[in-house]
Amino acid sequence: MTALDKALVAPKNLNEDELAKMLASTDEGLWREIFAAAREVKAKCGKTEVLPRGLIECSNVCAKNCLYCGIRKGNDKTVRYRMPEEDVLGCINEVRRRGYPAVAFQAGEIEGEANTAYYERHIAMCRGLEVTLSLGEQTEEVYRRWKDAGAMRYLIRIETSNRELYAKIHPAECSFERRLGCIRMLKRLGYVTGSGVMIGLPGQTIDDLAHDIVFYGDENLDMVGMGPYVAHPDSLMPDSRYQLPTTNYQLSLRMIALTRLYLWNVNIVAATALEALDPENGRRRGIDAGANVIMTNLTPAKFRVGYDLYPGKVKT
């Protein structure tokens, strides 16, 4: 039985070595079979319907200085903003007008009472909508308060499951253990919990990416949001490449397909970063590869320009 045959029998039926060998393959015929198999599993699990989420980028103020990020604390070229309540409410109303069942609040990572209360108020405005938060590392008390206010899902990206690589792309004050602890805390508190990685980081290997997929399963994630690494001109990242079998874009599509084959029933986001590299077809190809969630950016244009995570970031 081939690895692909095994993947179609049951979830988590591939080992890390098999995932790595598939990721490293340059056989286009094999990849056509893998993408078709991912679609087959998606249909088998009832994941063919694309789930829309209205995305609101509430603030680009961030206390973290992650080396890769355009809105990192140390980037003094970024004009900072925090959306006033009336603008947030306007976005929530637009989510309802479009008939989307869910809204997602995303922002730079800030802790403190003012920030906690800001999102409590906005979550309370979303009655009748499913609320996803992507607001980074917080205390257990804060996560509890937001859940009590009505939040249902939380996405906190680990960016890489390789601790050594994590340390290379973050300043010393950013703790891998704390971030992993937040993922586990969110699960324990009853959130529908998601995480994900960047694909194509300097120093990253195929073995790292295969381990990332296994990490998703080991942590029993409900959602996965991952996408290609797109270098920001104001980044502090080293300008180095490793040898990949293909581009960050193609490898991201392959990661989506293999994550679907490994986890089966998970919700996978077709990341906006795919359209930074393929503006016409990026997210559609993500859906074809096995994803089933689309985030539509509803942030007003006057704020959206400031949420500059990476070059070419899609504005819709």
Predicted features along the sequence, with ranges:
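Flexible, acidic/Gly-rich N-terminal and inter-domain linker regions that tether
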Residues: M1-K64
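Canonical Radical SAM [4Fe-4S] cluster-binding loop centered on the CxxxCxxC motif
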Residues: K47-D87
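Auxiliary Fe-S-binding modules of radical SAM enzymes
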Residues: M1-D27, R96, G217-T316
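Conserved strand-turn element in the central/C-terminal portion of the radical SAM core barrel
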Residues: I110-E113, C182-D208, M226-D234, P245, ...
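Glycine-rich, proline-tolerant flexible connector loops at the mouths of alpha/beta enzymes
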Residues: R53-I56, D76-V79, V103-T116, E164, ...
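Core AdoMet radical
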Residues: K73-L89, V95-I183, V192-I199, D222-G225
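Catalytic cores of alpha/beta
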Residues: T139-W146, P202-Y216, A276-D288
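Conserved, mostly hydrophobic/aromatic
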Residues: A38, C66, I156, L186, ...
